[in-house]
Amino acid sequence: MAEKIKLDSVDRQILHDLQDHGRMTNVDLARNAGISAPPCLRRVRALEDAGIIKGYHADIDSDALGYSVQVFAFVGLTSQAEIDLQDFETLVSTWPQVRECHMLMGETDFLLKIVAHDWDDFQKFLTSHLTPAKNVSHVKTALSIRSAKQLVGVPISQT
């Protein structure tokens, strides 16, 4: 978990710019934040050390790599004991098709975002990995027809 630190407007500008443009140079980042490059780099490193910046990633077009199927799976478990929840999360982390895993409150225990090349690929994953997994009691799926919005990170205000 990220260490709580007080962010000023310069830190927020740096975070905003890096979240939108992860490859922005330190010089451009400093210019946008209104400071020189050396203190800007120190601030970026401090934000990384505090766990606020967790990494830098490329936004890859899944269709371009042949992943044309995106499915959301609502997974119910037989047991919600903490050890069983952790075991399921550990198992899910080994499946590259699962891009996101969220534990939910309510009738469903987990929501998984799964990508696949095609329906056969998804069905194979579903029947050979997800549904027979230990402690899984039921799985409901919903096919994503299209995505209207996919933003990473969080809204960053300047105040």
What residue ranges belong to the model's regions?
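A compositional/biophysical signature of low hydrophobicity enriched in polar/charged and small residues
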Residues: 1-159
